[in-house]
């Protein structure tokens, strides 16, 4: 069976950490920001981890 190709869109959105966990950016931080609190925008800047149920599919998409 041939190797899986990396999903290039997923590769740009997710990063696999050294521990094996997958990080992602939060949504709702690209436009229409004037009505959002500074506190909310600050929290949206932080990275978060992919949920455990989604991790296997993401890991498969970004497989090297």
Curated annotation (Swiss-Prot):
TM annotation in the entry: none
Family matches, as InterPro entries: Ribosomal_bL35, Ribosomal_bL35-like, Ribosomal_bL35_CS, Ribosomal_bL35_sf
A Pfam family hit: Ribosomal_L35p
Record protein name field: Large ribosomal subunit protein bL35
Biased composition (Basic residues): 10-44
PANTHER family found in the cross-reference section: 54S RIBOSOMAL PROTEIN BL35M (PTHR33343), LARGE RIBOSOMAL SUBUNIT PROTEIN BL35M (PTHR33343:SF1)
Molecular-function annotations in GO: structural constituent of ribosome
Family: Belongs to the bacterial ribosomal protein bL35 family.
One Gene Ontology cellular component annotation held by this UniProt entry: cytosolic large ribosomal subunit
GO biological process: translation
Annotated region described as Disordered, given as residue ranges: 1-44
Source taxon at top rank: Bacteria
Keywords per UniProt: Ribonucleoprotein, Ribosomal protein
